[in-house]
């Protein structure tokens, strides 16, 4: 027991010795002078070179009003409005808060004595320029991803969105800065498959009765190999048939819409063309009605070709020789006797001119008869036409036009009464001729009259005998 008691006493004495030699902790108050080669003890203190003392800093929200010296510590004061100090400092003044946030920014932290104002961009924009305090100075709109592209989960370093192409099985049909690629619709009956920019289109699960007969035209052909009759179509064939059913009405609708436009255009153009033709015809008819009635003054006789005229001459000659051989001679006699009886005395110049013209006409007829007897031994007819053209409404006083036909035969003798033939009046002998009437005579030297069928082969009449008569009258 003795050694144990000794050991307890020894330990107790050692504890008392340790307690007596301990140094109490010292609290250093500012200002104080640091030991050579050492700095101030804590971060809330600073070394004043002028006083060569360690002095206390001002807490956040305050600034240094008076610096320390060898006998007194630093004196601090609170910051004014719209000013702040955020850390322990030895500033002479507080810092100014940032300006108010713009319209495209949102204030996420207000200005106080201990902190600055912080602004952030509103939704749809990103910060293009930041300050050291974390506030945004300039905001810009986020980029938009078009159809076929979606917004990636990560952002660019400046906060702008990143676009990525939609993977197979997904799509994006919008232009947005927030939409991501969405998966395609899952259809039990697929009508139109989807792609990166459009979603899949599903066919109706219960087809209508009108679409059922179309399965005969759009269904896939059966395999050529023989199969049992009781075998039912597999599940792979049904979707293809129903898919074509769903797509058939869409094709027909687009076809009808495409055909209706050309038909309407063609009908409109045709109607416009017919209307224009009708207007042109009406204008032409109105212009024709306005023209005067007397326009054509030249008597035209159709010309018969040589080949047809030769055949017609033979038939005419045979017909005239058999029917009226004596009538032609009588017409010649009547014309001659009428000229002798109606010849006036020499004292009247107009009568003398008519007599000379009648004698010249008889001489010309006799010469034609002699020429025809030596040449072709046939019957020839000479036609002289006097045409009166008048547009006046007064038809009571018009001179009668006369056509004399002379048929010659070398053996015939004139035997006819002068009463059967009338002597034509000259222009001066027409007493009741109205001013509107004009007499035009077909002259051989200006416009030769085409010979008729009976006149083929005859010699043309002597040119200029009407001119000679006109000279004598003058």
UniProtKB/Swiss-Prot annotation:
Sites of Phosphoserine modification: 331
Cytoplasmic side: 289-474
Top-level taxonomic group: Eukaryota
Entry-linked CDD domains: TNFRSF1B
Compartment list: Membrane
GO biological process assignments: aortic valve development; cell surface receptor signaling pathway; cellular response to lipopolysaccharide; extrinsic apoptotic signaling pathway; glial cell-neuron signaling; inflammatory response; intrinsic apoptotic signaling pathway in response to DNA damage; negative regulation of cardiac muscle hypertrophy
Signal peptide (residue range): 1-22
Stretches for region Disordered: 220-243, 295-314, 321-378, 397-463
Biased composition (Polar residues): 429-442
Disulfide-bond pairs as recorded: 40-54, 55-68, 58-76, 79-94, 97-111, 101-119, 121-127, 136-145, 139-163, 166-181
Low complexity bias: start-end ranges: 324-338, 363-378
One Pfam family recorded for the sequence: TNFR_c6
Residue ranges that the UniProt entry lists as topological domain Extracellular: 23-258
Glycosylation sites: 30, 69, 195, 208, 224
Keyword terms of this UniProt record: Disulfide bond, Glycoprotein, Membrane, Phosphoprotein, Receptor, Repeat, Signal, Transmembrane, Transmembrane helix
Gene Ontology CC: membrane; membrane raft
Membrane topology: Single-pass type I membrane protein
Keyword Membrane: yes
Function comment: Receptor with high affinity for TNFSF2/TNF-alpha and approximately 5-fold lower affinity for homotrimeric TNFSF1/lymphotoxin-alpha. The TRAF1/TRAF2 complex recruits the apoptotic suppressors BIRC2 and BIRC3 to TNFRSF1B/TNFR2.
Subunit structure: Binds to TRAF2. Interacts with BMX. Interacts (activated form) with XPNPEP3.
PANTHER family (UniProt xref): TUMOR NECROSIS FACTOR RECEPTOR SUPERFAMILY MEMBER 1B
Name of the protein this chain belongs to: Tumor necrosis factor receptor superfamily member 1B
Annotated source species: Mus musculus
């Amino acid at each position: 027991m003795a050694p144990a008691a000794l050991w307890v006493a020894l330990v107790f004495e050692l504890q008392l010795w340790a307690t007596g030699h301990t140094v109490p902790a010292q609290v250093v108050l500012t200002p104080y002078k640091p030991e050579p080669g050492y700095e101030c003890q804590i971060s809330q203190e600073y070394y004043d070179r002028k006083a060569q003392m360690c002095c206390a800093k001002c807490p956040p929200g305050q600034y240094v009003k008076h610096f320390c010296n060898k006998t007194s510590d630093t004196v601090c004061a609170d910051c004014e409005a719209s000013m702040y100090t955020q850390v322990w400092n030895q500033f002479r003044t507080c810092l100014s808060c940032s300006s108010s946030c713009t319209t495209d920014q949102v204030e996420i932290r207000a200005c106080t004595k201990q902190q600055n104002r912080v602004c952030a961009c509103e939704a749809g924009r990103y910060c293009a320029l930041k300050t050291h305090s974390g506030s945004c100075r300039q905001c810009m709109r986020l980029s938009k991803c078009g159809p076929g592209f979606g917004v990636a989960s990560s952002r660019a370093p400046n906060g702008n969105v990143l676009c990525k192409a939609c993977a197979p099985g997904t799509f994006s049909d919008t232009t947005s800065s927030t939409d991501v690629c969405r998966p395609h619709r899952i259809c039990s009956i697929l009508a139109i498959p989807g792609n990166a920019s459009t979603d899949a289109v599903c066919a109706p699960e219960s087809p209508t009765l009108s679409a059922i007969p179309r399965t005969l035209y759009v269904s896939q052909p059966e395999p050529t190999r023989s199969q049992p009759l009781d075998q039912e179509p597999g599940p792979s064939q049904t979707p293809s048939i129903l898919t074509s059913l769903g797509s058939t009405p869409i094709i027909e609708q687009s076809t009808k819409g495409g055909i209706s436009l050309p038909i309407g255009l063609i009908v409109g153009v045709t109607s416009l063309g017919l209307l224009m033709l009708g207007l042109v015809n009406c204008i032409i008819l109105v212009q024709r009605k306005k023209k005067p009635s007397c326009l054509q003054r030249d008597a035209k006789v159709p010309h018969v070709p040589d080949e047809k005229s030769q055949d017609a001459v033979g038939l005419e000659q045979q017909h005239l020789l058999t029917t009226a051989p004596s009538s032609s001679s009588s017409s010649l006699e009547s014309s001659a006797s009428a000229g002798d009886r109606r010849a006036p005395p020499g004292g009247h110049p107009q009568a003398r001119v008519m007599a000379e013209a009648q004698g010249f006409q008889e001489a010309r007829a006799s010469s034609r008869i002699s020429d025809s007897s030596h040449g072709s031994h046939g019957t020839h007819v000479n036609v002289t036409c006097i045409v009166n053209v008048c547009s006046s409404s007064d038809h009571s006083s018009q001179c009668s036009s006369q056509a004399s036909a002379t048929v010659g035969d070398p053996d015939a003798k004139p035997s006819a009464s002068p009463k059967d033939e009338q002597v034509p009046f000259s222009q001066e002998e027409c007493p009741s001729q109205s001013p509107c009437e004009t007499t035009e005579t077909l002259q051989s030297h200006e416009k030769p009259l085409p010979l008729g069928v009976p006149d083929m082969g005859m010699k043309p009449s002597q040119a200029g005998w009407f001119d000679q008569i006109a000279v004598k009258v003058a």
